[in-house]
Regions:
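Cytosolic-facing regulatory segments adjacent to core modules
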Residues: 104-151
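G-domain G4 guanine-recognition motif of GTPases
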Residues: 14, 31, 164-165, 189-204, ...
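Conserved Switch II/interswitch segment of TRAFAC-class P-loop GTPases
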Residues: 142-145, 156-174, 199-202
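Beta-strand-loop-alpha "switch" segments that mediate conformational coupling across diverse proteins
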Residues: 216-247, 255-258
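Extreme N-terminal, non-catalytic leader segments
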Residues: 1-35, 46-47, 88
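Hydrophobic positions on the alpha1 helix immediately C-terminal to the Walker A/P-loop
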Residues: 40
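Phosphate-binding loop that captures ATP/GTP phosphates
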Residues: 11, 60-102, 224
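NTP-binding/hydrolysis catalytic cores, primarily Walker-type P-loop NTPases
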Residues: 4, 242-295
Length: 295
């Protein structure tokens, strides 16, 4: 993956870097497992829905531990079942709390570049015809360290990195940002700190991280805010529900609402698009990445 030649990497950056989605597509990533990425995705989705947005979560988990599970939903199929004719693409979509829609695509989708050209074209056409009117897509990405997962993650208009405290977590998040910037030309990132003890701690970590990334990688890291250490959030996770619904006066609920309010003011992409157009870009990215791997 990291051994692309210059022409191949440039082609992939060109394909995945276009701001063509029109609506907001935000990939939620982390540098390590257990950072709280999935819980952040699920709770942000509910907070956005309560703010009047139509939200779709694309859940890439193939272990049943993604955003669908965090919202109490049980996927019965994934994209591989669609290709096998066991269900339709529309039938994959689950409806969660506050009408948040979840599309559980499964881990097999990350290997879409290895599908036959016929299956790729059919899948792209199916996504184009998908009846899913949304204006915010949150991608709960499986593993940012998995090269096969990258087309889905990189076709977004925004990348949000979830960072818990600790030197190891900071180092791994920095490595993730470095890889995405140097290999794929990503220049802007959003930073959400998780399990933070105080606003002062959050400001210090965010400031140091952003300064280091700007100095050594020449990238911009915008600090979004923080989610506090909150036992009610942990309890909501165990209950497979959102803290926004279960504990409306919890500290973490307040922070998710602030985060959603801030996201509503983010600049909108210049051109219009839809879920189908976004997923077509993902499929094209997977095809090119597989070609690069073989070449």
């Amino acid at each position: 993956m990291d051994k692309f030649n210059c022409d191949q990497a440039a082609g992939l950056r060109s394909l995945l870097g276009l701001g063509q989605a029109g609506f907001q597509v935000i990939t939620v990533m982390s540098g390590q497992q257990g950072a709280g990425k999935t819980a952040a995705t699920a709770n942000l989705a509910v907070a956005l829905a309560r703010g009047g947005r139509d939200v779709l979560i694309i859940d890439q988990s193939h272990k049943g531990q993604g955003a669908a599970a965090a919202l109490g939903l049980t996927p019965r199929h994934d994209v591989m079942d669609v290709l096998a004719g066991r269900c339709t693409l529309d039938a994959l979509i689950l409806t969660g709390p506050d009408n948040v829609q979840v599309l559980p695509i499964g881990g097999g989708f990350s290997r879409l570049g290895r599908l036959s050209e016929r299956d790729q074209e059919w899948l792209a056409k199916s996504f184009t015809q998908l009846q899913c009117g949304v204006d915010v897509v949150l991608v709960d990405m499986e593993e940012a360290t998995d090269p096969d997962a990258l087309p889905l993650g990189l076709a977004a208009s925004e990348i949000m990195v979830v960072l818990p405290p600790g030197n190891t977590a900071i180092t791994q998040a920095y490595t993730l940002v470095k890889r995405l910037s140097q290999n794929f030309g990503k220049r802007q990132f959003r930073l959400l700190l998780n399990r933070i003890e105080s606003p002062e701690q959050a400001q210090a970590v965010a400031h140091n991280f952003a300064q280091t990334a700007e100095r050594y990688l020449s990238v911009s890291v915008d600090y979004l805010g923080y989610i506090p250490l909150d036992e009610r959030l942990n309890r909501a996770n165990r209950l497979r529900t959102s803290v926004v619904d279960a504990f409306p006066v919890a500290q973490s609920t307040s922070q998710f609402r602030k985060l959603a309010d801030g996201l509503l003011r983010w600049p909108q992409p210049a051109s219009l698009g839809n879920v189908g157009g976004f997923m077509q870009r993902v499929i094209e990215g997977g095809r090119l990445m597989e070609s690069c791997r073989r070449g």
